[in-house]
Amino acid sequence: MPISALHGDMVVSRGDNLGWSAAWKINLYGRLGDGESAYRILRGLETEISIHPQRDDSDRVPSMEGNQGIQAFTAGIAEMLVQSHASEIELLPALPKEWPTGSARGLRARGGFTIDVVWKNGSLSSATVQAKYAGECRLRCAVPVRVLHGNREVQGRRVDANVTEFATEANAVYSITPQP
């Protein structure tokens, strides 16, 4: 059984309660690529526990140990949109169907990268990758992508159908679009 399946079983067996661990479960489901489960908990926190302005609308009081809960909550959203592990940046790894269109700016990835991402109809529309350092960027996306630096197409290497690797220059910005 793959390690992700074991972790997924552990998260599922503990349930989707909205107590102090809920914000961390958003992160765990996001890391496992399960955007629907992450969204279900996120939505529960928003509607069933009063993190919204009208505290009187809920009979449940939030239990998010100070800033820790809010940090985990926002980190979970970021985890649903961009992940960077094993020298790879993955765009929209756990996008729930409830977010068919949207954007995020300034998401950080390992290796000194800053990511902006836009999606429409549940799929990548465009992204930018800003490299702080010169080196390699390995990008994973559900659709094959094209990489531009300014108006010039960057010659990358297709590692597999969903992974493109390309060289970066320090402080350069790269535009990412789905291949036509």
Protein language model annotation of sequence segments:
Residues 67-116, 120:
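Catalytic cores of secreted or luminal carbohydrate-active enzymes
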Residues 128-144:
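Surface-exposed beta-strand/loop patches in extracellular or lumenal glycoproteins
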Residues 101, 111, 123, 133, ...:
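Residues that act as N-cap/strand-start positions at coil-to-secondary-structure junctions
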Residues 115-117, 124-131:
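Short, well-ordered beta-strand segments enriched in hydrophobic/aromatic residues
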Residues 1-84, 88, 125:
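Active-site core of glycosidic bond-cleaving carbohydrate-active enzymes
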